[in-house]
């Protein structure tokens, strides 16, 4: 038996205070926090896909090598968002056991190329674009042209999108 002293961190159990379809308000360690609940979105779900599109989407969502460009490698470039997919996930900190919700966002351009990120800011910007640009399913989608930008955050640089125009050819 060793005579080592170990510092043990005590944390409170998180208590859910309230919940909406978009957020969970929790009380944890003496503070209130709002945790986002991410939705799965797929702009192609309203139409029948070709075999090639289905194969590409499967490989994209399965993480196949070369199926998407990391968004941080595309900073400064402009992208016409023809289609998009968002996939929520939960990760667990192995040291603390704390769960954190996240979301993967895939933007698909007019050439069928995908750009991927786990940036929460991009997810929320995409949702605001859905309000601004309409919906695929009802034919009101105006294809936005966005610039991929790097933004300063408390934990380093993050990704986001800046609306720069609309694609006139649909």
From Swiss-Prot:
Region (Oligomerization), start-end ranges: 1-26
Single GO term (MF): DNA binding
Keyword entries, A-Z: DNA replication, DNA-binding, Early protein, Viral DNA replication
Cleavable signal peptide: none
One GO process term, biological-process aspect: DNA replication
Family assignment from sequence similarity: Belongs to the phi29likevirus single-strand-binding protein family.
Domain comment as written in the entry: The N-terminus is required for oligomerization.
Chain's role: Single-stranded DNA-binding protein required for the elongation during viral DNA replication by strand displacement. Displaced viral DNA strands are transiently coated with the ssDNA-binding protein and therefore protected againt nucleases. The latter is then probably removed by the replisome that performs lagging strand synthesis or during the events that lead up to the recombination process. Has helix-destabilizing activity since it removes secondary structure from the ssDNA in replicative intermediates.
Subunit field text: Hexamer.
Annotated protein name in UniProt: Single-stranded DNA-binding protein
Species of origin: Bacillus phage GA-1 (Bacteriophage GA-1)
Gene behind the chain: gene 5
């Amino acid at each position: 038996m060793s005579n080592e002293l170990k510092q043990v961190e005590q944390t409170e159990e998180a208590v859910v205070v309230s919940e909406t379809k978009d957020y969970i308000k929790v009380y944890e360690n003496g503070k209130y926090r709002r945790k986002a609940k991410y939705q799965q979105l797929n702009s192609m779900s309203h139409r029948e896909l070709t075999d090639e599109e289905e194969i590409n989407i499967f490989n994209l969502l399965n993480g196949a090598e070369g199926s998407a460009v990391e968004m941080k490698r595309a900073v400064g470039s402009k992208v016409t968002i023809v289609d998009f997919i968002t996939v929520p996930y939960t990760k667990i900190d192995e040291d603390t056991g704390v769960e954190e919700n996240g979301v993967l966002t895939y933007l698909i351009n007019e050439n069928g190329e995908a750009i991927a990120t786990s940036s929460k800011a991009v997810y929320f910007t995409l949702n605001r674009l859905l309000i601004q640009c309409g919906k695929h399913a009802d034919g009101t989608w105006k294809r936005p042209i966005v610039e991929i930008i790097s933004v300063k955050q408390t934990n380093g640089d993050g990704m986001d999108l800046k609306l720069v125009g609309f694609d006139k050819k649909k």
